[in-house]
Amino acid sequence: MNPKFGGLDLAQRVDNSALVVLELDEGVLKQVGQKVWAHIDYSLIFKSLAKINELEKFNKISYDRTGVGDAVAKLISPPMRKICRPVVLTIKKKFELITLVKGLFNEKKLSIHDRDLFREVTEQEVVTSDAGNLLYRHPQGFHDDRFWALALACDAGSYAVRGITKARAIAASPREMN
């Protein structure tokens, strides 16, 4: 069974919440699923996510906790807390994620099968703010929920696709010297 990674973008005002599922297959993160929720209660989203996890068996899910705070973490069921990782989408983090998505895509390490999601990826525009900062945004009147869900899923799976494991604290037994 190939590792699976999820990215969950939580709605705040008028947006939808979205989940993108990526599967690591022969070094490529392939989109194998997605779900979009109309603006509904976060508790229903996390209940649905737990059911989806029963089918998909996620290795990790990165979710956007920007603006929703720690209250959302309390809605995640205890078994799901082991695989759910909160990400605060600051301007710097958004640049990192956009760079990651574009890098994986250019390296042919990311495969997107959904036409609408692909459109959301290509719609991202670079603009300069009044203060001279570079910003990414999507065209007015369009949603970018699935794009950020994809970016978060790439974040969750990036270590696996690059063959790098995240450092973990493990108890090691002493080596025997011969």
Predicted regions and their residues:
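RNase H-like, metal-dependent nuclease domains and their acidic two-metal-ion catalytic environment used
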Residues: 1-89, 95, 99, 103, ...
